[in-house]
Amino acid sequence: MKNFAEKFLDENPDLEKVEFIYVDFNGIPRGKNASPKTLIKASKGGLKMPISSYVLDVWGDNPKGTGLVMSGDGDAICRVVENSLAITPWSSRKNAQCLVSMEDGDGNPIYADPRHILSTVLKRFEELELKPVIAPEMEFYLIDQKLQKNGHPQMPLIPGTNRRYEEVQLLNLNEMDDFEGFFDLVEKSARLLGIPAETAIKECAPGQFEINLLHHDDALLMADQAFLMKRSIKNSAKKFNLNATFMAKPFSEHAGNGMH
């Protein structure tokens, strides 16, 4: 009987690449790009990556004190999160992506895996007969890919003009329409990735928007979906020569971004 990886490859014979992704302590996606055949290898526990990469700092350096690098920088087995395997619609070729979690040779989760840490917290909720219900609201700015001369970000140009967005315009549908192609791609991405994206609105600053996910009571799944939604937004923006930033305060004079 074929497993999920073999079935996925049968359904997508023209697949060109698979991205194996895990999230480090800072929310940065790390992993490998590999040939489609590697998916079968990964589904059987044959894909490995270094444990130390979970605790890299935001500059990608190994922080002192973890002991992971000096002890040999060992690898761990990467297990595919099956329900995360999907085609990526923002790719120029037919590519797929999936999340992975790391475990040791005995099947025990790696202590530094954020998914494992969250699972441990959720077990404590279960002991209290509680179940958290999560519905993230994700705020972000769409900005020009070109920075100002001083290195600061700048608003994108209003389509068909040489002017940049300046007005707050909360809930303005005209500004949403200006980025219709971007939001269509984000919606398509959410649908293909199984992300319960519910609404998108214009937020309280020029070029600022919010996408809400529909609430449910599987907190680990919601954490996966929120990460994948953020990645989808960033990659979709690049297709329209924009950058999406979730930075807390990219503009000192405008409202900050939050996730609540």
Segments predicted by a language model, with ranges:
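ATP/Mg2+-dependent ligation/transfer catalytic cores
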Residues: 1-199, 221-225
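Generic beta-strand/beta-sheet core signal
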Residues: 21-23, 143, 200, 212-214, ...
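A broad, structure-centric signal for solvent-exposed, well-ordered loop/edge residues
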Residues: 41, 46, 204, 251-253
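Short secondary-structure boundary/hinge segments and terminal tails
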Residues: 60, 142-143, 207-208, 254-255
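Short, conserved phosphate-binding/catalytic loop or strand-edge motifs used
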Residues: 138, 203-211
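Histidine-centered active-site/metal-ligand motif
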Residues: 201-203, 260
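Acidic, glycine-rich loop-and-beta core segments that form the ion-binding/anion-interacting portion
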Residues: 208, 213, 219-260
